[in-house]
Amino acid sequence: MRRSYLVSAIVLALAGAPLFPAVAQSAPPAAAEQATTQLPRTVRPTHYDVAVTPHAEALSFDGKVTVTVDVLQPTASITLNAIDMTFSSVTLTPVKGKALAAPKVSIDAENQTATFTFAKPVAKGEYQLAMNYTGKIGTQANGLFALDYDNKDGKKRALYTQFENSDARRFIPSWDEPNYKATFALHATVPATQMAVSNMPIAKKTDAGNGLVTVDFAQSPKMSTYLLFFGLGEFDRATAMAGKTEVGVITQKGASSQAGFALDSAKLILAEYNDYFGTPYPLPKLDNIAAPGSSQFFSAMENWGAIFTFEYSMLLDPTVSTQADKQGVFSVEAHEMAHQWFGDLVTMRWWDNLWLNEGFASWMEGRTTAKLHPEWNTALEAVGVREAAMNRDAIATTHPVVQQIDTVEQASQAFDAITYSKGESVIRMLEGYVGSDAWRDGVRRYIKAHAYGNTVSDDLWREVEAAAPGKPVTQIAHDFTLQPGIPMIKVDSVQCNNGKTTVKLTQTEFTRDRPDKKPLSWHVPVIAKTLSGEPARALVDGHATLEVPGCDLVIVNAGQSGYYRTLYGASQFDAIKHAFTKLAPIDQLGVMDDTWALGMAGLQPASDVLDLAQATPVTADPQIWENIAGDLSSLDGYYQGDDARQQTFRKFAIARLQPVFARVGWEAKAGEPDPVKVLRNDLIGTLGSLGDPAVVKEANRRFNAMDKDPSAMPAALRRTVLGVVARNADAATWDRLHAMAQAEKTPLVKDQLYALLSVAHDKALAQRALDLALTDEPGATNSSGMIGAVAGTHPEMAFDFAVAHKDQVDKKVDSTSTARYYPALATRSLDPAMIDKVKAFADKYIAASSRRSADTAVANIQYRIKVRNERMPAIDAWLKKHGA
């Protein structure tokens, strides 16, 4: 699954900002504790025969399922997962024999189970469990859900499913755990004018009368329940052949012309993966289904043979799409298609090893994008992925990559930066350690050995070690996946003799909120090299001395494949600063990010990051300037509420970025590299957010001219320019944007316009956006994102509003996301009062076992306050020293 954050990818791109009244009550009642969700091990399903008849307008469906089961030991009852279902009949029949007496049906809503208790114990053997039931169609993206949207033909409704992690039980009474793999035969009785889609191709259609048809899909391979998919609506399907596999993109009717790049990309990626994994994709077809709308929780889902996405992550509308959108489409496909092997063909045994799915798919996404589109220069993005992980891993509420999971909510919260980004970074480090060929061979062995089965992490390590004899892969992997945290390698001394540089290294642990913590220990694969020499490698555990060929400046973690911080001494850092332009771009990024993190933690001067920004020429790689723009934007956020100091900082930041933007310009140049196109939008967004008068003025000029002169708002700039306008909007401009949103008929563009309404600096306009989010006008999938976007600039306002209107907001948030949604609204706050507010909310509404997100929000607020109070004075002093 491609995770999403509180603010959808659309909102983030529009806002150009990083993500991220409740009254504290005395002694609020504690939220109910959740029990473990794992089922008894007495029965195992082998096949589901499922028949559904959806009633889209009534938001309900009728279901009938016959499950072939093996009773593994005598039992008086059978327990499976079910939620929001009403059973009309339940029958258990031996494969050879007569049906048993009807069981007593007991529903446990809290534990999301149904238990069928029989008059006599059920003997071991094979049975068929037949159940007739009715279920609910939701309006948020879990279970079987409806999405309403507008197009040129009026209002439409489509149905889709989203089952990961634990929502197949809303569609089928089932053993809804990843280890219970079975085959599925799905039959759907649907309107004859609509298209039904599932994991497998349609095998047969039968007229069911009254304008209905029954669609029988071919039987699936053995798979986990969360990978089943069903979709229904007025769809188009564009197809192509990739070898023997039919690939398709399914869209709302009339939008398939926007699917060309996704379809072409699917063909390329499938060929690459068939080769890399050494096991051909086993299904006859592979669809990408693009739906209008968004979710707070995810942007795409790897259902086997029927990948679900939202339109913003799959389609390219020529009137609004950018180069970043194009790269995003490819990345989403590369991620979800990697899951067809890592996750679908081979699946983790339980959610504690979720990272086996997500970390690997994220790594494969980055690797494949860099290989198949080298012109995008995305290899540098690996440093940003590592930073996303370390930002989460450096605080007390972090957790190991392999983590304890007991409840549905804990499983939902496992989809985080540790699972995805740290998992990806650890894989990248291990591949670099054993070599790319040995790693690939180990992966092939793993896929072959465990196809159609379930695994734990050690199954992967075992196969990689077999492909890389003599390498302690399991030892290293255990250090980085079974314990939390970040190693820090201190460069104690550097001396050159006889053409070699001797580097003394000491390992400790990096944290940003526990300076006195006793450090953990890791076996860290370290790569060091001089500017022009060959790399030297060592496995560092405690202290190490490394001889590096050449006598020159030494970079530790050269190539940035290691998951650790590097802390240089003052003289060493000074040498790096003066030779900064000679470093490889990926090492420039790595040094910058280490400098930022170490400076904010008080381990080196916080102003060192500004020295690096000053040392960077305007001709540096676009990704370097994207990073600098991000750092400057982050520093600006710490001045929130202190106008005088903020204006001093903004003067410097704008002056630093303006020469780069002058070189890039407003207009694209023929033949310019793709990374420059991305940088242009980043600079416009950042300068607009910083209040650069020239950029704000030009953005407003283009906005006012767009109706008469379409060239004033080219597709490549439209979203970014409108974002600058919206951030700096007055009431009249906000009203105009609102009218545009109301009149727009294209769902993707409409969603973008509603997102724009939520990013204004003006508090009165932010309040109007919050009020609008509670109405039905934006649509349920946009409303929660609008509140989240307001939180990017006004976290206290957004949190207080959401909690004060919790009953209404709950209806607009995925049920799997609520424990994360509310606390994260506050995470960018600098107000100490928010700490107690978040704690009070968690005490009242969130089970103690599910409060990691709330605790993390509190930790982030505390960290931000500490940075503002203890680090920003050094930034002020640097600005004064340099005449800003």
Where are the regions a protein language model picked out?
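A surface-exposed beta-strand-loop module
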Residues: D84-N151, P173-D176, G209-G211, H543-P549
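Extended, low-hydrophobicity, Ser/Thr/Pro/Gly-biased non-transmembrane segments
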Residues: T68, N132-F235, Q258-F261, Q404, ...
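Beta-strand-rich binding/interaction modules
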Residues: S88-T93, V473-T474, P484-N557
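N-terminal, polar/Ser/Thr-rich
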Residues: A24-D62, G97, D153-A158, D176-P178, ...
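Gram-negative bacterial Sec-dependent N-terminal signal peptides
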Residues: M1-A24
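Surface-exposed beta-strand/loop patches in extracellular or lumenal glycoproteins
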Residues: T66-M85, A185-P191, K504-T506, F510-I527
